[in-house]
Every structure is written in structure tokens, then in C-alpha cells.
A protein has these predicted regions:
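Beta->alpha turn/N-cap motifs
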Residues: 93-97, 107-119, 195, 211-218, ...
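Pocket-lining segment of extracytoplasmic ligand-binding domains
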Residues: 183-273, 284
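Sec/Tat-exported extracytoplasmic proteins
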Residues: 82, 86, 108, 113-116, ...
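N-terminal hydrophobic or amphipathic helices and topogenic motifs
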Residues: 1-98, 105, 123-126, 131-135, ...
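Bilobed "Venus flytrap"/periplasmic-binding protein-like clamshell domains
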Residues: 57-85, 139-204
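Solvent-exposed, acidic/flexible segments
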Residues: 67-75, 93-97, 130-134, 163-174, ...
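An extracytoplasmic/periplasmic, membrane-proximal ligand-sensing/linker region
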Residues: 193, 197, 204, 214-223, ...
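Signal peptide-directed extracytoplasmic domains
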Residues: 111-153, 174
Length: 354
């Protein structure tokens, strides 16, 4: 029986291209013939979007802190992250975390870096938390011979100590700890000066010790940690403080965390830590909130971790302040599915609609 000649296979890829081309031409023809109906519809949709949610501002202000502080350093990194989305982030210097609360409540800034435990004032209800992004230990730096396992009352006796300045988070936390020890700070031994001046005075021997609340990003902290003859007080009762003050955690700076040759620190150091928090008003545009949250996540991914409990940020910790709805979705689901593929404000809009 003679074989039947084989039929050539259809050129599938060519057929698909022709079908797609035909569909696109038909779609274009439909647009051209019905533009008088389609264009007004598009304009109405755009107008509704603007009415329901205005465009995000081109400039945002955030209160940071003192020069060389953790908040200033983080703010500079956030400013670069915002610039990638063509948003200008203005860094507004301040006395510190407590002062930042006043700035945001008075409307002078749109957002602020703060810390757990600061007084929220009478208008705390308008604040929303965008989460905690890092630990900020309470450091007690001192000069002279290294002291081990000493009670704070005994350690501070006859020492001249800087408590930082009113309005700073360092001052707030230092006063709370000293009050718990029933230490009277209204004496000449306790002086008032900002972190930079305290650092200089400690180096010169004009004071014996200084309190400062700051993360490892702070240039002041790095300067002091690298200075010969300057030591860190070991808060050996850190667990007791953490039980008394709910906004504090007991953390450890592990032996060798700073350097392995020579080993620095030479032993584990117990510290108390609050957190760096991002606060905003309940009126801050949701798309701008997403920029802050994304910048916080990128900051955490790129930074070096030093402390024993450093791997849980960013997260919501200070429950005194309501968590923003945008932050709640972000911590649960991450960035919107259009993030990185569309302008940030469109990704934010679809995130809420979806």
C-alpha cells in the first residue's frame, strides 16, 4: 500500500503572530472609532482618583535629632531612598526624640523619628506608628579605669555626668533610670549639654561620664567605642529594668562584636535598649507612608547587626501609638505587587483597592 505524503505542519508561531497583530489592529480601530466615548471616560476616572485620593506631596519633612545622632544618619539614608522616587525628604534637626513629638503635633513636620518611652503629650491620638526600625541602647560611657559589676548608685557617686539636654530621648531615659534608683539629679554633678559637647568634654576630662541613647549608626557612639580610655558601663541588672519599664529590652553587645583582633569588647556587655520609631500623623498620604516603610526595610537589610536580638526589624512594638493601616498591611504582606513596576503612588493606590 503506497504511503500517503506527509502534510506540512502548520506554522503555529506565525499563526499566533498574525492573530495577535489582528487583535491589536482591531483594538486600535475600536479606539479610533470610539474615542469620543473613551476619552471622557478616562478623564472621569482620573478625576475620581484625584478626588478620592490626592496626589502625594513632592516634599516631605521629617524631624531627626542632634548632629551625628542615629536619627540623623538614618534620615540621610532615607533621603536617598525617597530621591529615587522623585520625592524630596527634608531633614529637620531637633533636640531629640521628645522634641520631635512637639514638632509633629504642631504640624511643623510630616513625620518624626522617636523612641519608645517618650511622653506623647496631649495630642498623641493624631499620631500613627510606622513601626520600630532598630534598637537604640542607653549607653553610659565613662573615662578612667574599667569598672566591672558595679551598682549604678555606687558607680555614679562623686562622678560628674552629662544627662544630655531637655527634649532629647537620652535625657528622658536617663532621668527615668536615675529616678528608679532614687538618685537626685538636681546637683552640680549632673550637667546639661548635648551629645556632641558631652563627647568633647569627656575626651578632655571635663566630665567623667555621659548618657546617650543611640544606635550603632551614630557617629558619636562609634567615636567613643574606638577611643582608648573610654569604657561602657555594664548594666548587669538589665533584665530588672526591662521588667519595670515595658518599652525597654535587655540586650547584649557580644564579646568581639566590634572587632576580633584585638577582641572588642573583651567581654559581653549588658545594655538597655529602646527602639527607633517612625511616627506620622493620621493625615500623612498612604503612598508616602509606603516610602517610609520600604526605606526602613532596605535600611535593615543593608546594616550590620551587633546585638543579640537585632534580627526582628522593622516591626510594630510601641503599642501606645496606633499602628497605621498601611503599616499593618506592609508588615503582613510586604510591598504591593506593583511595587517596582509602576510609580510608587500607583502601586499604593492599587494596594488599597486590591
Amino acid at each position: 500500500m503506497p504511503r500517503r505524503p506527509k502534510k506540512p505542519l502548520p506554522k503555529v508561531s506565525r499563526n499566533y503572530r498574525e492573530i495577535i497583530a489582528d487583535e491589536l489592529l482591531a483594538f486600535w480601530a475600536s479606539l479610533v472609532s470610539n474615542w469620543i466615548f473613551i476619552l471622557p471616560s478616562i478623564l472621569v476616572i482620573v478625576a475620581l482618583v484625584h478626588l478620592v485620593r490626592p496626589m502625594p506631596p513632592a516634599t516631605v519633612r521629617i524631624a531627626t535629632g542632634q548632629p551625628n545622632s542615629t536619627s540623623e544618619v538614618i534620615g540621610q539614608q532615607f533621603r536617598e531612598a525617597f530621591a529615587k522616587h522623585h520625592v524630596k525628604l527634608e531633614l529637620i534637626p531637633s533636640s531629640g526624640a521628645q522634641d520631635n513629638i512637639k514638632l509633629i503635633e504642631s504640624g511643623q513636620v510630616d513625620a518624626a523619628f522617636s523612641q519608645g518611652g517618650v511622653d506623647l503629650g496631649e495630642h498623641g491620638g493624631v499620631l500613627r506608628s510606622l513601626g520600630s526600625i532598630a534598637y537604640q541602647p542607653l549607653w553610659l560611657f565613662y573615662r578612667g579605669p574599667e569598672v566591672k559589676q558595679q551598682d549604678l548608685n555606687h558607680f555614679l557617686k562623686d562622678r560628674t555626668v552629662s544627662l544630655n539636654i531637655p527634649g532629647s530621648g537620652s535625657r528622658v531615659l536617663a532621668e527615668q533610670i536615675l529616678q528608679a534608683h532614687e538618685i537626685n539629679i538636681d546637683t552640680p554633678r549632673f550637667v546639661t549639654m548635648n551629645a556632641s559637647d558631652s563627647l568633647k568634654a569627656l575626651h578632655k576630662g571635663e566630665i567623667d561620664a555621659m548618657f546617650v541613647v543611640a544606635g550603632m549608626e551614630s557617629r558619636n557612639v562609634l567615636d567613643l567605642l574606638e577611643s582608648p580610655g573610654i569604657h561602657v558601663f555594664d548594666f548587669n541588672m538589665a533584665d530588672a529594668y526591662a521588667r519595670r519599664f515595658k518599652y525597654l529590652d535587655a540586650i547584649v553587645l557580644p564579646r568581639g562584636a566590634l572587632d576580633l583582633s584585638p577582641v572588642s569588647p573583651s567581654t559581653n556587655i549588658n545594655l538597655l535598649a529602646t527602639t527607633v520609631d517612625i511616627l506620622a500623623t493620621d493625615q500623612l498620604h498612604p503612598a508616602i507612608q509606603l516610602l517610609f516603610l520600604d526605606a526602613a526595610r532596605n535600611f535593615d537589610e543593608k546594616r550590620t547587626t551587633f546585638f543579640s536580638m537585632d534580627g526582628k526589624f522593622p516591626t510594630y512594638m510601641d503599642t501606645r501609638i496606633p499602628e497605621s493601616e498601611v503599616a499593618r498591611r506592609f508588615f503582613k504582606e510586604g510591598t504591593p505587587f506593583l511595587w517596582g513596576y509602576a510609580p510608587y503612588w500607583i502601586a499604593s493606590l492599587f494596594d488599597e483597592i486590591w
